[in-house]
Curated annotation (Swiss-Prot):
Stated name of the protein: Large ribosomal subunit protein uL6
Family per record: Belongs to the universal ribosomal protein uL6 family.
Compartments, as annotated in UniProt: Cytoplasm
This protein's record includes keyword Plastid: no
Domain of life from the UniProt record: Eukaryota
N6-acetyllysine: residues bearing it: 121
An example Gene Ontology biological process: cytoplasmic translation
Keywords annotated in UniProt: Acetylation, Cytoplasm, Ribonucleoprotein, Ribosomal protein
Keyword Membrane annotated: no
Organism: Oryctolagus cuniculus (Rabbit)
Amino acid sequence: MKTILSNQTVDIPENVDISLKGRTVIVKGPRGTLRRDFNHINVELSLLGKKKKRLRVDKWWGNRKELATVRTICSHVQNMIKGVTLGFRYKMRSVYAHFPINVVIQENGSLVEIRNFLGEKYIRRVRMRPGVACSVSQAQKDELVLEGNDIELVSNSAALIQQATTVKNKDIRKFLDGIYVSEKGTVQQADE
């Protein structure tokens, strides 16, 4: 069965400007600008109201999979709005049984060097995605803090760090060493 029209709206806060260029959404906020291209999805995007403070996503004559893209786009736009207002922060903790993992931040937080992982001499270097800054936490031992506006870039950078510390040729149930995401949140606290 085909649904004639499925639509959802996203409310845009006062301190955020949103603009459409075809199916490319550009969100401007206090922390910066994010843009995202939805050209590969066949939907209609439109701004409603006099002040253009509501984004509507329409999908005509879609099957079940195509209708799911409506909510997906809304979620992506909400994440962009959250990113340019509050920013995203991921915290990662080093876990080790014997050899302490030594993490050094290079190039103003854009390069992470991991040394002494499982006592290895090899230095693992992980470059952060553009727009993501990494720092060593002052409050907590063995903690990395990743901050940025784009949730996909921040989470992807965290994944790259976690994948760099995979244990090879050992039983991973026993060898739990690595750097893992311990907390996901925002840079600024939401006023709620």
